[in-house]
Every structure is written in C-alpha cells, then in structure tokens.
Curated annotation (Swiss-Prot):
Any GO CC annotation of this UniProt entry: cytoplasm
Protein name as catalogued: Lupus La protein homolog
Protein source organism: Mus musculus
A Gene Ontology molecular function term of the record: tRNA binding
Residues bearing the modification N6-acetyllysine: K116, K128, K327, K356
Compositional bias ranges of the Basic and acidic residues kind: 377-415
GO biological process: IRES-dependent viral translational initiation; nuclear histone mRNA catabolic process; protein localization to cytoplasmic stress granule; tRNA 3'-end processing; tRNA 5'-leader removal; tRNA export from nucleus
Residues modified to Phosphoserine: S92, S94
Gene that specifies this protein: Ssb
Main function: Binds to the 3' poly(U) terminus of nascent RNA polymerase III transcripts, protecting them from exonuclease digestion and facilitating their folding and maturation.
Length: 415
C-alpha cells in the first residue's frame, strides 16, 4: 500500500485530478454522497479505480490508472491511499470523517459565503478558476432556478472561518469587470428576511392608503402622483432575455432605494420607480461603474422621465396596481397582498376560502382537491432537488458515476 505525499512537483493535470478525488472523499461531500458511502462499506474503504473513472468530472480528466496513481502520490494533503496493486483507492483511516453534529453544521454555515454577479452562462470550471487563488474551497453550489438555469450566484464553503472572513473583507471584487455582491451566507438570509419584513410593512401602509383613497376620490391619488415626480427612470436597449427585476435591484443597491419596477422578463425596456430622485440614483450608479452602467453586460439607454411622459407613466403605474389589486381580491384575497410581475408591489397575506379540514386554502384553488398544509422547511436555498437521489453532482454537492449515458453538470445528457 502506498500513501500519497511525495514532494514531487505536480503538473496542472495532476493537480486537477488530486483536487477532484479529494473532493469526492472530502469532509463536505462524502457524508452527503450515498453512492460512495455504500462503496466504502464493501472492502474496508477501498473503491476500485474502475468505478472512480466513471465519475463524470474525473472521467473528463483521465481514465488512465497510472496517471491517477502518479497524481495521488504527489499530493501533500495525505488524504488518500493507493492499494498495493494500484487498482483501488480509499480515504486514509487516519483521517476519519467528522461527526455531523449540530455544532459541525453550524461551523459549516459560518464559513459559507454567498457570491452574486457571475454571468448565467458561466460554468463550474469558470467559477473554480476564478476562486483558485481566493483560499481553499471545499464546495461550490451553483444556485439554479426551477428550470435548472444558473442564477448567477453561488454558495462557497471555505476550509475555515478565517479564510472565509479574509475573502469577504476584500473590497471591490469583480468577475470579468462585473462587480460582485459578497456576503456571509447567514448575512444573506438575514438580508432577505429583512427585505420580506419591509415589504409586508409597505404592503400594509399601501393598503391603508388605498382604502382611504376610496373615501376621498382623486385627492389621495393626486398627492401620491405629485410625490413621485422626478422619481422615474426609464431604461431600454438590446437587453439580455434573462434580465430580471433582481438585476436592477442589485445594480442600484447602494445608490437609491427602488420602490417598484415595471418590467417583464424578455422585454426591451422598463421603468424604475425610486423612493427619492431618479437623477441622483443614476449619477451615483454611473460614478460607481466608471460612467459605464451596463445591465448583464449589455449597453442600456437610461432616461429620467419628465413632463407628459412622466405623468402618463405614473398614471399607468397607479392604474396597473389598482387593477391587479382588484383582480386578486375578486379571487378571494384581502387588501395588502403581494403581487409579482409588473403590478402591485405589496406583501402576501392569508387568502380567503377554506382548504381541507376547514383550514385556509389559497386563492383560485380548484374545488374538490385537498391542499397541503403547514410550511415546508427549506435549507440553503430554493433550488434543492426534490425526491430520492442516487447521487448529486459535483457543482451542486455530489456527483454520480456515469452509467451508459454520462451526465452533464447541469443535469442534461452528455452526447
């Protein structure tokens, strides 16, 4: 049996091979990897290299046993062992896995970092390359939509709280000239919760104002419109089809508070309503981006609305909000609910109607069908796969060895 750790210099390929195998058997992945955990029970922890080369990412690097053995022999991590006949590998018994206790889970959470600002077509290898000199990373989770599209943000787990803190405190970090939003994972979720609370407060205030406005025709609406003059910013151009309202909130996050965005994904123009003057927010954002204010790396025409165009846009905003509120209420909702899209900007509340067992149902629910009750607890983010899993993927937490058809890292079939 040969242990790794020789002081020979690694080639770039050997370094990638070691990194990949040590990830598979590492503290973060192995406890979550059902397939590998089953394999290591069969032969005192040994896993045949014939099995390992079926793992997609290792398979793309090499299928040559000698190359793998040679690479592991040069690793300084001392995590892996190679069998005497050089056909099997295992995690060294002298490096047992940490016990997955609440304390351990809390430690992992404290060294996890949220990073946003990557292009949606970035690959796991692109992100790994960017993070290569940022500290030792144990895991990268690419956050995806329900349709498996990359959101442009990740969660990265560092090897220690100190290295995570050092990374977070680096000012002005960019990915290919794009500013990145970097927060500790716990701070990110706290920020999202605070935004939801603020939305609920604004929703209640808006509902109250609309209720009072019905008793004073014209007066409330007029005052509201006057208070928003100079606060509208129009944007237009050959926008990316994946451009969304969240991109605008991120772009102006430190320059002006956005109250409402009239924009639908796929459109080529839209309007932003700021709490304060739009001109000031635009100037601050431009100055922070060296005068070149892009949206998903696309050129955009920015224009502060004035005069007749401004009045018409404000009137449309008010009308759309009221129309959406009326439609929702007609389905059984109460004033003060939150609507997504280019309509009312308020927070969700309880719906009318009753579900199974005389419990509250949801607006527009089909009659005669039972509903789920209670709340579903989610961990990490809203992109976690549902249902039983044989193995995950390397960029998401785990990876499954390829069978007859190999898998891509985004879940599609390799060809």
């Amino acid at each position: 049996m040969a242990e790794n750790g020789d002081n020979e210099k690694m080639t770039a390929l050997e370094a990638k091979i070691c990194h990949q195998i040590e990830y598979y058997f590492g503290d973060f992945n192995l406890p979550r990897d059902k397939f590998l955990k089953e394999q290591i029970k069969l032969d005192e922890g040994w896993v045949p290299l014939e099995t390992m080369i079926k793992f997609n990412r290792l398979n793309r690097l090499t299928t040559d046993f000698n190359v793998i053995v040679q690479a592991l022999s040069k690793s300084k991590a001392k995590l892996m062992e190679v069998s005497a006949d050089k056909t099997k590998i295992r995690r060294s018994p002298s490096r047992p896995l940490p016990e997955v206790t609440d304390e351990y889970k809390n430690d992992v959470k404290n060294r996890s970092v949220y990073i946003k600002g990557f292009p949606t077509d970035a690959t796991l290898d692109d992100i790994k390359e960017w993070l290569d000199d940022k500290g030792q990373i144990l895991n990268i989770q690419m956050r995806r939509t329900l349709h498996k599209t990359f959101k442009g943000s990740i969660f990265a787990v560092f090897d220690s709280i100190q290295s995570a803190k050092k990374f977070v405190e680096i000012p002005g970090q960019k990915y290919k000239d794009t500013n990145l939003l970097i927060l500790f994972k716990e701070d990110y979720f706290a920020k999202k919760n605070e935004e939801r609370k603020q939305s609920k407060v604004e929703a209640k205030l808006k509902a109250k104002q609309e209720h009072e406005g019905r008793h004073k025709p014209g007066s409330t609406e007029t005052r509201a419109l006057e208070g928003k003059m100079g606060c509208l910013l129009k944007f237009s151009g050959d926008l990316d089809d994946q451009t969304c309202r969240e991109d605008l909130h991120f772009l102006f996050s430190n320059h002006g508070e956005i109250k409402w965005v009239d924009f639908a994904r796929g459109a080529k123009e839209g309007i932003i309503l700021f709490k304060e003057k739009a001109k000031e927010a635009l100037e601050k954002a431009r100055n922070a981006n060296n005068g070149n204010l892009l949206l998903r790396n696309k050129k955009v025409t920015w224009k502060v609305l004035e005069g007749h165009a401004e009045k018409e846009a404000l009137k449309k905003i008010t009308d759309d909000q009221q129309e959406s509120l009326n439609k929702w209420k007609s389905k059984g909702g109460h004033a003060g609910g939150r609507f997504k899209g280019s309509h009312v900007f308020t927070a969700a509340r309880r719906f009318k109607g009753k579900g199974k067992g005389n419990r509250p149902g949801y607006a527009g629910a089909p009659k005669g069908r039972g509903q789920f009750h209670g709340r579903r607890t989610r961990f990490d983010d809203d992109d976690r796969r549902r249902g039983p899993m044989k193995r995950g993927r390397d960029g998401r937490d785990r990876e499954e060895p390829a069978s007859k058809h190999k898998k891509r890292e985004n879940g599609a079939r390799d060809k």
